[in-house]
């Protein structure tokens, strides 16, 4: 085992102890305005508590073991219609496999989905969705039995995608579970985009979970997919990316699997004791774990602390995965523009990284623009210098 040490190299920059002091959970969870001071909002997430006596229970068979609904979306709809100013909603998921999309609208109160199995994989929400689907295929896949109807709480979300006039639905409509609400919590369950290896290694964005709201918490959750597994994002009601604010998320004691950019988005997200497992089975190129698109004025993007990074046997030889790359979202026509284009921010610290990853050059060229990675190793460096990437490590161990 080898420990990474300051200052590293221009291809693999390492933070000093003093620099690393800034990259802690409280800093990531404190939201500030553009000037760094106004509109300060401090979030202090605690362990997820659930109500086992909740009236909304999802099970494989309605009427058995207290199940009131056969699908997760049915339970979400019923709970939102009957909330009657409840401060929060808990939805219990009995062990089973639930096939179908789950959409949670922006105006939902704090909502918790929790599995009652002994392990997170005892409760599975799954569907095969592909960004390359046509709108017609999307409608057939997501709404073949009228799961979404006008007047339903999340109808607008479905309709934004079902009514698209493009040839394909794109990444923004390819999520199995999609929440636009603040204060979403998920505990002890698994979400799978079941497209997996049924497609080739080209671009097939297939999101398991997408979150747009603020103060998102995942605990003992498994997210499984290939490209774009977890979209931890910030957007508006029209399903558009926004650049004037960001959301926060806390992912703890969880497992995330994928191949290309499989943790990505504009939110400020902390991954605490998360196992990231990179797979080669689809034959994809440009394999990266992270692809943040933090705005240049946002000091904090993604933080992975006390995490594990592993890969499958496809990386045991000369082929290696990358830890991540910046996503220069929105700059395909202009190229990277300092202080305008997103400049993804990420710190991986106090974590273990196995031999599946490129030790010499763990960061790839930016998505969208192919901007070459530029690490700042100057002794007087500004960690937010827009002329450089903001992808860092601290106190990690390279496993043999």
Curated annotation (Swiss-Prot):
Recorded GO CC terms: cell outer membrane
Coiled coil: none
Pfam families in the record: Pectinesterase (PF01095)
Protein keywords: Aspartyl esterase, Hydrolase
InterPro entries listed in its UniProt record: Pectin_lyas_fold (IPR012334), Pectin_lyase_fold/virulence (IPR011050), Pectinest_B (IPR054974), Pectinesterase_Asp_AS (IPR033131), Pectinesterase_cat (IPR000070)
Site (Transition state stabilizer): 227
GO BP, sorted A to Z: cell wall modification; pectin catabolic process
EC number: 3.1.1.11
GO molecular function terms listed in the Swiss-Prot or TrEMBL record: pectinesterase activity
Presence of keyword Phosphoprotein: no
Positions contributing to substrate binding: 171, 205, 325, 327
Protein name per UniProt: Pectinesterase B
Lineage: Bacteria, Pseudomonadati, Pseudomonadota, Gammaproteobacteria, Enterobacterales
Gene: pemB
């Amino acid at each position: 085992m080898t420990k990474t040490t300051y200052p590293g190299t221009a291809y693999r920059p390492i933070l000093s102890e003093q620099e690393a002091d800034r990259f802690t959970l409280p800093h990531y969870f404190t939201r500030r305005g553009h000037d760094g001071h106004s509109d300060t909002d401090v979030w202090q997430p605690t362990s997820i508590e659930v109500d086992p006596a909740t009236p909304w229970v999802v099970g494989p068979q309605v009427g058995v073991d207290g199940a009131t609904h056969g699908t997760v979306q049915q339970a979400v709809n019923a709970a939102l219609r009957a909330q009657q100013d409840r401060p929060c909603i808990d939805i219990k998921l009995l062990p089973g496999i639930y096939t179908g999309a789950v959409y949670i609208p922006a105006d939902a109160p704090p909502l918790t989905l929790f599995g009652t199995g002994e392990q997170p994989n005892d409760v599975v929400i799954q569907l095969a969705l592909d960004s390359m689907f046509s709108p017609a295929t999307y409608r057939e896949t997501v709404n073949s039995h009228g799961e979404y109807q006008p007047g339903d709480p999340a109808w607008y979300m479905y309709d934004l995608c079902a009514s698209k006039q493009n040839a394909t639905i794109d990444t923004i409509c390819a999520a199995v579970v999609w929440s636009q609400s603040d204060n979403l919590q998920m505990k002890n369950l698994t979400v799978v985009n079941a497209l997996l290896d049924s497609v080739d290694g080209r671009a097939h964005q297939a999101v398991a979970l997408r979150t747009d709201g603020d103060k998102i918490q995942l605990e003992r959750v498994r997210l499984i997919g290939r490209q774009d597994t977890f979209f931890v994002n910030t957007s508006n009601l029209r399903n558009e990316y926004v650049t004037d604010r960001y959301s926060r998320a806390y992912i703890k004691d969880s497992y995330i699997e994928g191949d290309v950019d499989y943790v990505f988005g504009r939110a400020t997200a902390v991954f605490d004791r998360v196992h990231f497992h990179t797979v080669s089975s689809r034959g994809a190129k440009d394999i990266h774990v992270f692809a943040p698109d933090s705005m240049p004025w946002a000091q904090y993007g993604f933080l992975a602390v006390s995490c594990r990074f592993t890969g499958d046997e496809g990386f045991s030889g000369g082929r290696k995965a990358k830890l991540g790359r910046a996503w220069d979202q929105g700059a395909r026509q202009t190229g990277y523009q300092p202080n305008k284009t997103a400049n993804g921010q990420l710190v991986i610290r106090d974590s273990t990284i196995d031999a599946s990853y490129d030790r010499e050059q763990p960061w790839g060229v930016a998505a969208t623009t192919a901007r070459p990675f530029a690490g700042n190793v100057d002794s007087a460096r500004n960690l937010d210098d827009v002329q450089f990437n903001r992808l860092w490590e601290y106190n990690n161990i390279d496993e043999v």
